[in-house]
């Protein structure tokens, strides 16, 4: 995910760059395991996206994101509540290319667009949403499930306005942020997403911004309420371990042409040598000692056949 919402002008207004530190990083991206056949033979020895050049990859944390979610290892928690989502379309402000993704930002001075319930103790205000995607449809998501990649992943970023005065403060502290992750898979055309796609040509270059009013991002959510949750971090600098992740089990369908429009965006500003905005995801991080909890029972999800109780006529005397 990216928290680069107030990061346009200087470090003073940047919740992402406040803690950036310079040091050496490998120029090659490690191989990312993937169960899709197209991922088994591909190489990932590409130059890092501009955001990661000359920056620390891991700040010695043990709750880093993204992770590979192992379905059978996740723990069903009956105490997890349903997630309640209430977004006011009128709070949508604009869409912009921040040089790493495209963000749709929202007015967040009041509780007009919030989530509550689920694993959360407080209401969290919607700040922005953005996507991560690959150079082709075989990969692109930040999280994986049983090592399976999806073509793209949506992140809806919320902050805890009960405990913190600002998004910038919340982004650096434990339990400061709640991010809903939604996988995108190839399928039918997504009508609501098309409104976003139609706007992308106007923000092709880095640091371009246009107004984008009256949009309810809940239309990008799957209908299934099931989710996984775990404690993690931002996936862009400063990589703060401030995030309660809520990863939706069910992906949403988009078509190939819509994803291709994502790939027309550029990491670079107008006048610079063009560099396509693709593969803007962080490599997988180790789970360490964390537990991934699920809001659903595994026997239902994995279609395990449960033997029915014997009828009275079948019971031996």
From Swiss-Prot:
Pfam families: Carb_anhydrase
Cofactor list: Zn(2+)
Enzyme Commission designation: 4.2.1.1
Alpha-carbonic anhydrase domain boundaries: 37-296
Domain of life: Eukaryota
CC per GO annotation: cytoplasm; mitochondrion
Enzyme class: lyase
PANTHER family: CARBONIC ANHYDRASE, CARBONIC ANHYDRASE 5B, MITOCHONDRIAL-RELATED
UniProt similarity note: Belongs to the alpha-carbonic anhydrase family.
Function: Mitochondrial carbonic anhydrase that catalyzes the reversible conversion of carbon dioxide to bicarbonate/HCO3.
Protein name: Carbonic anhydrase 5B, mitochondrial
């Amino acid at each position: 995910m990216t928290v680069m919402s107030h990061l346009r002008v200087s470090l003073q207004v940047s919740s992402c760059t406040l803690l950036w530190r310079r040091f050496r990083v490998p120029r090659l991206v490690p191989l990312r395991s993937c169960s899709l056949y197209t991922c088994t033979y591909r190489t990932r020895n590409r130059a890092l996206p501009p955001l990661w050049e000359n920056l620390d990859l891991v700040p010695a944390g043990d709750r880093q994101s993204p992770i590979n979610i192992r379905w059978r290892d996740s723990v069903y928690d009956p105490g997890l509540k349903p997630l309640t989502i209430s977004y006011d379309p009128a709070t949508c402000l604009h869409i912009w290319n921040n040089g790493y993704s495209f963000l749709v930002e929202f007015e967040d001075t009041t509780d007009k667009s919030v989530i509550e319930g689920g694993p959360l103790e407080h209401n969290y205000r919607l700040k922005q949403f953005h996507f991560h995607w690959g150079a082709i449809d075989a990969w692109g998501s930040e999280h994986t499930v049983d090592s399976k990649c999806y073509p793209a992943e949506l992140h809806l970023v919320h902050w805890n306005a009960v405990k913190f005065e600002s998004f910038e403060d919340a982004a650096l502290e434990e339990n400061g942020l709640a991010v809903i992750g939604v996988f995108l898979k190839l399928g039918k055309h997504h009508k609501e997403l098309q409104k976003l796609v139609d706007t992308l040509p106007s923000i092709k270059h880095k640091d371009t911004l246009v107004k984008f009013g009256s949009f309810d991002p809940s239309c990008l959510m799957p209908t299934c309420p099931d989710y996984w949750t775990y404690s993690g971090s931002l996936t862009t600098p400063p990589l703060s371990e401030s995030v309660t992740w809520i990863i939706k089990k069910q992906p949403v369908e988009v078509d190939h042409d819509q994803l291709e429009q994502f790939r027309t965006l550029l990491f670079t500003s107008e006048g610079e040598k063009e560099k396509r905005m693709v593969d803007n995801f962080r490599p997988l991080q180790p789970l360490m000692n964390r537990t991934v909890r699920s809001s659903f029972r595994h026997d239902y999800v994995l279609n395990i056949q449960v033997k029915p109780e014997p009828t009275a006529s079948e019971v031996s005397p």
